Structures are given as C-alpha cells and as structure tokens.
Design a protein with these regions (language model features):
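Structural motif
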Residues: 16-17
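Peptidyl-prolyl cis-trans isomerase
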Residues: 1-12, 21-361
Length: 361
C-alpha cells in the first residue's frame, strides 16, 4: 500500500462552491490581488527579524507571557483540552512546535527594542519556506479566516450573477494593475511567481467586479440611515480618561480630588504620577458587564473605581457623541453589517465551509 504524503498547509481546502474547492493558497493569492497581503508581509518580516536578533543575542523571553498568550489563544478558540488544541492545529497543518514558535515570534515582535533593519523582500519573490511560515502565522493570527470570508463573498456574488460583464472586468483589471504598480508587459512574470496564469487572474478580477457592483447596489444612503436608526445607542461614542492606581484607597483619593476639589482627572494623575491615558470607544465594544453603567451617562461623569486584578482604574467620561453617517468609523460599521447580512444569505446558497468558520457567523 503506497504511503500517502501529508497534505501541505497551502493545499488544504477551506471552502467549496459547487465542485470547486478553494485552498489556503487560493485565499492568500486572491488577497494579494486585493492588496491585503503587503502590509501583513511587512509586519511578518519585522517580527521575524526581531525574533532572529533576539535569538542571536541569546535574550531570554518571559515564559509566563508566552504561556498567557497560548492560554488566551485556546480560550478564544474554545479549545479546552490539550487534545482539542492538537486536533485544531492538525486540521490546519500546524505542528505544536510551530504553535509555540509563533508566540515566541510575537513576543519578540512586541518586546525587542534593538536596532532593526528588516528585509525588503516582497511576498511574491519569497522562498517557499518563507511563504509557508507566513501562512502558519496567517492561520494562527486569524488573518487567513478573515481573508477566506472576504473571498467567499466574492465567490458567492459571482455564483449568483446571471451574466458576464466585460466592461466591469476591464475596469477592474486596470484598477488592479494601477494599484499593484505592475506594467501590462510585466504581468506574465508576476503571475509566474505565484504559479498562476492569466485565466486565473481574470476569474479573480471578474469575481471582484461582481462583488463591488453588488456592494454599490446595497450600500445606499437610505440603507445606511435605516441601519443606523436601531443602532443609535450601541454606536454612541465615548471618550474616556483613565487613571490606573495600585489600591482602593488611592482610587478613592482620585475620585475625591475630582468630585470635591474640582480637579481635572489628568491633573490628579500628573501630580500623583499615576498612569493616565485617553481612549475612544463605542458602546457596543464595551464589555457587556460594563455597558449598563454607560447607558445614561453624560460628559463629565466619573465612575466609581473598577477593580483590575490587584489594581484599580478610575474612569471619567470626557465626551459623549451620538453616531452620525459623517463619522467614517460609524459608517464603516454600518456598511459591514449590511454587507455581512447580504452575503451571509448568499453563502448559505453557494458556499460550503470545510475548515474555518467565518468570523461573522
């Protein structure tokens, strides 16, 4: 009986439509055409260089930080036992050693502070080994899931389209060449680096054109206004001022200085040398257990101290802003909801997930 070769990461089928399966390589290559790979590749090179230099200098990582990162990963993916984690990794072609190495790279990507000059190579010209390691990072970071979801929308849109539109394809091809800065005469060489041909590119661009046309039809101002109406409260924006202290008594002093003495919370933090920062958050992004206290607050509201492990935080609402379609973040949230709802209906008709569950489900 012949020995079966292990399935490599890039050829594992993530979803299918009809009789065609879409592999991890399909997902990454199509994301490359959409312009999504370049920033991820640059970050991958930066993190890998941090890791290389840290190991070269024999720096020691914080084992507790690595353990915490692995535990957080398992919690996020609902992997309770070691066996479930191993099965999850095996299904995706990732070894336990690669799992551990990923968290070590991420640790040094955050912690390494030495001089850095990462390589300037592109994804297209990278070695097979580099691309394979990059794919492992995409899997473990969740980026591949999101790319797969975006590709599935385009595949479903094309499957639902009754006819081809050559003009749209020509426009999409021109847009792609301009965005990728590829001369038409160089296109064949670029495709060869990916082991792809013109037919594949035309199929990818045709699906993109159909998807963009469908999106333009559903994202009208009227649709956005309708979507916003029931989301007014959830999309309310709060600017928060936060002071971090090490005891309940210290937190009580901060509250007293603000409420009784009329001091700005930033002044209290500066005088007492407490960590202070400002942030903006939408109500729907606040943990559920904290949302209730925000429902009726006004600008200037000071919350009672909030426990954070062995420390405490004091929050003050600096501003409260009602959502508006002129706010690009609010607009993007609403657009995402409309697009997800539309294409999830198409996915149920045209796409069968084999490996990943799309994030929006």
């Amino acid at each position: 009986m012949p020995v079966r070769q292990p399935i490599t990461r890039e050829v594992r089928v993530i979803f299918s439509s009809g009789e065609r399966g879409f592999t991890a390589k399909d997902v990454v290559d199509c994301a490359l055409v959409r312009g999504e790979i370049d920033p991820l590749w640059k970050e991958f090179l930066r993190v890998a260089e941090c890791d290389r230099l840290a190991n070269e200098r024999e720096l020691e990582s914080d084992d507790s930080a690595l353990d915490s990162a692995a535990i957080a990963f398992r919690y996020k993916h609902d992997l309770i036992t070691a066996e479930e984690t191993e099965r999850w990794l095996e299904d995706r072609g990732v070894s336990l050693a690669e799992f551990s190495d990923y968290f070590a790279r991420q640790y040094w990507g955050r912690s390494y502070s030495g001089t850095l000059d990462p390589p300037k190579s592109s994804y297209e010209t990278a070695s097979p080994e580099e691309k394979d390691l990059f794919l492992a990072d995409l899997i473990l970071s969740g980026s591949l899931d999101r790319m797969a979801e975006r590709l599935s929308y385009r595949v479903a849109a094309q499957a639902d389209e009754a006819s081809d539109n050559k003009a749209s394809l020509d426009n999409e091809r021109a847009r792609f060449l301009a965005a990728a800065k590829i001369a038409h005469a160089e296109l064949g060489d670029w495709l060869a680096l990916l082991c792809r041909d013109q037919e594949w590119l035309d199929e990818t661009l045709a699906a993109e054109a159909v998807y963009q046309q469908r999106v333009s039809q559903i994202l009208t101002e009227q649709a956005l206004q309708k979507e916003l109406a029931p989301m007014q409260l959830h999309l309310t924006r709060f600017q928060l001022e936060t002071v971090e202290v090490d005891s309940r008594n210290a937190a009580a002093e901060v509250v007293a200085c603000v409420r009784n003495d009329g001091m700005e919370i930033s002044e209290v933090a500066e005088e007492s040398r407490y960590p202070f920062h400002r942030s903006e958050v939408l109500l729907e992004d606040i943990p559920l257990e904290q949302q209730q206290r925000f429902l009726s607050v006004k600008a200037g509201t000071l919350f009672d101290p909030i426990p954070r492990g062995d420390a405490f935080e004091v929050w003050r609402v600096k501003t409260r802003t009602e959502p508006s379609l002129q706010d690009p973040i609010i607009r993007a949230r609403l657009e995402r909801r409309i697009v997800d709802r539309c294409f999830n209906e198409l996915l149920s008709k045209y796409v069968d997930w084999k490996l990943f569950v799309p994030p929006s489900e």
